[in-house]
């Protein structure tokens, strides 16, 4: 590698293969003079034996000096390698630190969010537990209320019965009281009174009282506070219930005074508010919380109802007693003579009393119409007793009763019962309050337990977080201590970077291990390159060593020769220095003793960048870049021995000589003519890809030119394809060879028919936009429109249909070596699943439309001849083809059998059989409107007449016909990251999408070959599209060619003659698009992880670049032989230095061959142009590479021949570096024909020029016609490596090259346009 570098950077090799050093030449001169003196004094015989020894000594001495020189070169290279490794390590360390900081921030945010979510989950769980507890309590309360309601109904019935009995007893008690008051009257009345008592038993309670005696009725029933005396029989039944109610273990909270009064008053009236059982008491408290007022409202309502019922009861009783007294007094006088039993039965008004009591009963019943069956039943039993018993029994009972003692006993019982009821009610109230309190405390206990658990968990989390914070604090203190120590260490700027303590032992071990691995790989690569170059040099220059050995002999041989001619001194090298104030280039002579003088002279300069401090953070990144660009500027200005012209750094071979050859070379240099951001309005747009527009083609299959809606023909008879085929078959092989060579030359010319329009794809984070410009006036944007919401990764210009395109329907007719496997179409109208049947790796994909089946094919039984089902619509479709296009029927002839048959069996082995499948809808007129948008093709466009759109209101019929032929003309194909493929017209109506389809993976590259478009997908397959029989592109039917498994992306493709080279991992696959098969595959790099990224074809060579590699590889286009390796990394490192910007770490991002130059764009914005050497690399081996004869390459699979042109060798010794570059990677190169400035004004309009170059530019060569080409470079930002950041924005590249002064504009996407004059070949 060092030997090659020495050759690369050497000024001129001179006439001999090696030049003696100055010391050896001095010694040789002195010895030569001494030998002359000896010969003059003595004779030649004296020095004949001595001279070989002296020559051997001098040769050894010269070789020692040469080895010493080589060792110094190797030492410098090793220092550069060490410097590169250190730079790479610093950059990787900074990137890793930045990534770790981002990761820590992301982890903290995720942890905080996780803690918040956990807190929310815990709170929701606590609320859920509380709600479940409440729901359980409500369910218990409902069940207790239901039980209480049932018991209250039972209790009400028993109380109602007792209430009726107590009314009777109360009436008897009133009668006895009145009789006791009247006992002091006369004896006669007492006798009559005793007789009346015998006639009217006391048990009936119907004694004749005066009408006014009803006013003496006590008011005990009218008072709500007095307990009722009717409970004297209820005591026995109610007492056990009170004992039962006291057994409840729950204790509610204390009641209110209103509740006590309500319950006491209700119980005294014998209403519904009687003694409640234990279940009722439980339900009262547990169901209703202490703060709810529902219980008070209900009790108030019941109280009001009972009070009204009570007043009505008292009124009814008074009326009833008065009526009974009057009836008894009136009837007693009339019926004294009747018998006692009969008188009692007849005079008893019980039926009337029943009616009254039934009315009373209906008004006083609190339970909505429950009949008092107990009252009726007791009344009936009373009548039965009276009717069946005799008067003697009744009299005995009445006479034996002690009315006065009985009343006092009843009063005592009533009073005692009242006290017991009050005690029981008070106990029930206390019990209910205690039960409610227990329930409330239970709920609070559960809630507090949940809160306690949450607090415990929070405590644990806080403890963990506290430990984490303590750990972080400890780390922060350690980092702060390290930072302080680092600041102290940084103050000692004299200490070199390599000696500072910055790493731990583990990091240092890892770095050393990685360094050793990189070093080992580097040494292996250097050894391989050195060995290859040595072998090539020895093979190409076999006489070099002989020249080196005979140079000293030649020097001393003059002693014995008669000629005394002195050797000519080599011309000193010319160094053109640019003087900025005068804009002139002045030659200067400078002696250079060795190759080392071209390398950096200051040995410490390799560590200039590393001696800087690295304390700049992200905020000061811009200032750091400015400083680095300043140092690049200083490095560029230090470089001597190179010519600077037109913004390029040229090698010294461009020195001015008398014959004017250098002037011609200077004249053909690229001249920068335009430099500006792509879009002044939108600064967020990023460049992605671009392509020049090819407006050629647009002809029908039979040679007709499409103009508007008409088709014109030059000579119809002469364009008969079948006749031409027959004539070509009858020609001799020599004429056939000549014709094929002419066709190849015609294809080369068609490929160069480009317009000056350029489509540029720019993207933001959400949308992709297409900007159309004219390279002649790149500042004027012709149009811009949005394509889709995904990134457009590639774009290709597809010319219109040509008569030289492969005919549709004959793709597999000539490939006899194709595997005869079964072929099946994949999507029928009833099934959406793809049926993969491979034909040499080919899958046919069809997208059927509604009403049109896409020729569904099924594998045959024998596996050799598939059955192709023809849709019945094909007969009607073919009849609609225009008569002016006869080849449309010829293209479908192979697919049709008989017109009346619907199925046809085709043998693949038969020649001429079209086995893809039937193209449906030839003219595009039967596509329904409700198609899926993925496969729907929009063929609408305007009428094309000489590339000018006609107004919509003109020629409606012609416009309708022209819409069908829209994709016959030149189109632009755009491939998006989401797998969508868009086809736009490149003639007019650019915004309108003619066709679109969604493929199964991202689209990475698109190429066109003779009417076939190949689309590379990220899953390792090629989608192959053809034109339909009408000449339009048919996106609904295509082939898929699988390059192998496992699937990897196809990164790049290029057209090489009539084949396509595909970059697939580290391999290159050569695909024959017509036969749709893989012809050849070979490794471009030994490692599988090294992917092929760019391919550039010219002549008989293809230049290949590898991912993350700075070496370009040249392969032969026909023999696939590896011809040359060119490493651009040493050149870039030499020109720009090896600073922290990483110019030494070169990766190639853009590659193009144009204007007999190899254009290389790198990942750090450097642009290199390397002139190609069309002739052979050396003339020493004329047998291997013939010069004047025409080389012809044959195809092993067919009789086709291809003319050999030239092999595009190049040498880094001739490389030219552009000082105009980008801040980021170079995205693309585009070359289109055009002329911005005239060749006469190119010297004056350029930014850097020379006097002689300017004068030579004004004299165009009359021998070779020159063609002007515009080369466009696109990338992020702009930088002038001579000016750095401070002056790069203010420099003007002529009048048409204004640069915006703001820094933000300098970082936008920029276009750089050069004009190159190249020969018309």
Curated annotation (Swiss-Prot):
Keyword Cytoplasm: yes
Residues modified to Phosphothreonine: 217, 292, 348, 365, 418, 586, 595, 1264
UniProt biased composition (Polar residues): 236-248, 266-285, 322-332, 855-864, 1255-1266
Domain RH2 span(s) in chain numbering: 500-604
Residues covered by region (Disordered): 203-308, 322-341, 473-500, 563-600, 853-883, 1239-1267
PROSITE patterns xref list: RH1, RH2
GO CC terms: centriolar satellite; cytoplasm; cytosol; lysosomal membrane; perinuclear region of cytoplasm
RH1 domain residues: 7-95
Positions of modified residues (N-acetylmethionine): 1
Compositionally biased spans, kind Basic and acidic residues: 473-489
Annotated coiled-coil segments of the chain: 66-166, 408-534, 724-758
PTM summary: Phosphorylated by MAPK8 and MAPK14.
Acidic residues: compositionally biased ranges: 874-883
Gene Ontology MF: a single term: mitogen-activated protein kinase p38 binding
Record flagged with keyword Membrane: yes
Localization (cell): Cytoplasm; Cytoplasm, Perinuclear region; Lysosome membrane
Function: The JNK-interacting protein (JIP) group of scaffold proteins selectively mediates JNK signaling by aggregating specific components of the MAPK cascade to form a functional JNK signaling module. Regulates lysosomal positioning by acting as an adapter protein which links PIP4P1-positive lysosomes to the dynein-dynactin complex. Assists PIKFYVE selective functionality in microtubule-based endosome-to-TGN trafficking.
Subunit organization: Homodimer. The homodimer interacts with ARF6, forming a heterotetramer. Homooligomer. Interacts with MAX, MAPK8, MAPK14, MAP3K3, MYC, and MAP2K4. Interacts with KNS2. Interaction with KNS2 is important in the formation of ternary complex with MAPK8. Interacts with PIP4P1. Interacts with PIKFYVE.
The family this protein is said to belong to: Belongs to the JIP scaffold family.
UniProt-recorded name of the protein: C-Jun-amino-terminal kinase-interacting protein 4
Organism: Mus musculus (Mouse)
Gene behind this protein: Spag9
